[in-house]
Amino acid sequence: MGWSLGGLLSTFVASQIKVNKLILVAASPCLINNTDWEFGIESHVFNQFVNNLKNDSTKSLKRFVSLQSKDKSQIQELHQSIQKFPASQSALDSGLQIILNSDLRDTFKNISTSKKCILGSLDTLVPVKIQDWYEAAGSKTHVLRSGHLPFLDNDFKI
C-alpha cells in the first residue's frame, strides 16, 4: 500500500516481487503532467512548491497540510508533527526527484495482481479524473469526498 509518493514506491515494488494486492491512496503512476498525461501536477506548480520547500520547508509543509483538510484539530495535530519531526533537506530533495522523474504508467498496467486505488474527489494533486485511466488499466477504484489526505476522512477504509 502506498500514499502519494509512496504509491510510486509501492507500484515499483509490486512490479518486482509477488504481492497479494496493490492498494494506492491518492497516488498516480506519474505525478507531473506532460504532453500525454493530464492526471498530475502542472510542472510550474511543482517547481514553485520545490522552491518554497527550499526556502522554508516547515512553513511549506504546514501550508500544504492546511489545504488538505477542513478539520482544524487534524490540521493542528499535523502541524505539531511537522514541527516535532522535521524532514531533512536531503530526504525532501530525494522525494522531489522521485516525483519529478518517475513515470510508472506502463509498469502499473503490467502488474497482474489485484489493484485498488482510493481517490479523493477534492484532491488537487491527483485529480479524480484519473479514475477512468485506473479502471482501464485493470484497477478497482473508490472515491471519497476528500482531498489529498483521504485517510483523514471518517469514511476511509481499506
Predicted stretch roles:
Residues 1-2, 25, 118:
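Short beta-strand immediately N-terminal to the catalytic nucleophile in serine-hydrolase-like folds
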Residues 1-10:
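Gly/Ala-rich beta-loop-alpha elbow adjacent to hydrolase catalytic centers
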Residues 55-102, 107:
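Conserved alpha/beta-hydrolase catalytic His-Asp/Glu region
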Residues 115-117, 140-143:
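Conserved beta-strand scaffold positions in the cores of enzyme catalytic domains, especially
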Residues 110-112, 117-123:
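Short beta-strand/loop motif that positions the catalytic acidic residue
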Residues 132-139:
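Active-site-adjacent alpha-helix of alpha/beta-hydrolase-fold enzymes
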Residues 16-52, 89-94:
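Flexible "cap/lid" loop of the alpha/beta hydrolase fold
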Residues 125-126, 143-158:
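Catalytic histidine-centered segment of alpha/beta-hydrolase-like enzymes
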